[in-house]
């Protein structure tokens, strides 16, 4: 999330809109790469400073893994998503993993070679990023140009506002396990985690649809098509919901190896999220952000976060089911807010 810093939404929109206007595309790519390069240097400085100031075990591992962080920050996945060529992202990820596996087989033979792992992992990531930048510059003839400071600041501020909304979303998603572990029990965390993964798997097709449609809608501003897709995806989500409920006992038995039976009930409770997610995913980036309603997008996320904080106060009083109910309430409110904003 920190590596993306909101550019996976804002930069994708800009690239999609101006992919055929060469000077604007050069300005967008240059601004984003300059910002991300400075951001990368800043993060590396923080890492080195922290390692020097604090007594951190295995310092060398942190340093060696930093190559992967650099690759993640500089990887132009946002560019390829914007021009609707996601196949390249798949190719680059495949190349990274392939290079990593080959190098690992060649160089790692015992526990004493453990430092090779982060080195090779970083090399694989850096190779994929370098190849991605090469394709962007050579095949699509993108050029780095001088950019006015106000344009750089503008893109940074807009991406930062999206990053803040992502923070709210991340807190909502990640803090459930922390609260359950601290106030209810680690066993419940395990049940919740398995059930949540099954439900998220059910939402995965809609997430992919969001990634594919967002740049197309941002480029063509074809919101009528988007609403047709939403109607279809809504009924598909209901079908997946039914399958999730039907197959929950089998899925929990398979993934939990017969030890996580209480997760079945949690899947039943959380499975309606598949339907609400189908609306939230497609109303958020593809409609609100594509139409330029960044403020409405951010406000909706922080309103949901406020409701989440209010609901979490009851975790101390009640139990796991209170937590699950609060998640459903938050998603329903978020869904209604997105729908209201999109209708306006």
Residue ranges and their predicted role:
Residues 4-52, 222-244, 295-300:
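Membrane-water interface segments that mark the loop-to-transmembrane alpha-helix transition
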Residues 40, 69, 97-98, 122-129, ...:
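Residue-level recognition of pore/gate-forming positions within transmembrane alpha-helices
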Residues 51-65, 246-277, 325:
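Interfacial segments at transmembrane-helix termini and the short loops linking adjacent helices
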Residues 89, 93-100, 116-137, 149-215:
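Transmembrane helical elements of multi-pass membrane transporters/channels
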């Amino acid at each position: 999330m920190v590596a993306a810093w909101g550019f996976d939404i804002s930069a994708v929109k800009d690239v999609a809109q101006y992919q055929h206007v060469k000077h604007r595309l050069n300005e967008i790519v240059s601004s984003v790469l300059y910002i991300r390069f400075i951001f990368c240097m800043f993060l590396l400085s923080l890492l080195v400073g922290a390692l020097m100031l604090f007594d951190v075990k295995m310092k060398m591992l942190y340093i060696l893994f930093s190559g992967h962080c650099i690759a993640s920050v500089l990887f132009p996945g946002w560019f390829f998503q914007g021009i609707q060529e996601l196949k390249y992202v798949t190719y680059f990820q495949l190349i990274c993993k392939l290079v990593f596996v080959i190098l690992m087989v060649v160089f790692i033979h015992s526990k004493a070679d453990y430092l090779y792992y982060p080195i090779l992992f970083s090399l694989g990531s850096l190779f994929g990023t370098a190849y991605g930048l090469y394709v962007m510059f050579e095949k699509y003839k993108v050029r780095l140009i001088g950019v006015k400071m106000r344009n750089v600041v503008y893109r940074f501020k807009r991406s930062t506002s999206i990053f803040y909304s992502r923070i709210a979303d991340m807190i909502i998603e990640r803090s459930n396990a922390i609260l359950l572990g601290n106030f209810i029990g680690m066993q419940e965390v395990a049940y919740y985690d398995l059930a949540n993964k099954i439900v998220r798997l059910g939402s995965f097709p809609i997430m992919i649809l969001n990634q594919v449609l967002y740049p197309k809608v941002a480029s063509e501003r074809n919101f009528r098509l988007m609403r047709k897709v939403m109607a279809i995806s809504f009924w598909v989500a209901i079908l997946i919901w039914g399958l999730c409920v039907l197959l929950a006992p089998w899925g929990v038995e398979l993934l939990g190896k017969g030890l996580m039976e209480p997760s079945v009930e949690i899947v039943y409770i959380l499975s309606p999220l598949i339907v609400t997610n189908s609306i939230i995913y497609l109303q958020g980036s593809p409609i609100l952000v594509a139409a330029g309603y960044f403020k409405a997008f951010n406000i909706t996320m922080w309103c949901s976060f406020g409701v989440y904080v209010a609901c979490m106060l009851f975790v101390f009083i009640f139990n796991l089911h209170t937590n699950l109910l609060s998640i459903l309430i938050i998603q329903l409110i978020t869904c209604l807010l997105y729908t209201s904003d999109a209708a306006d």
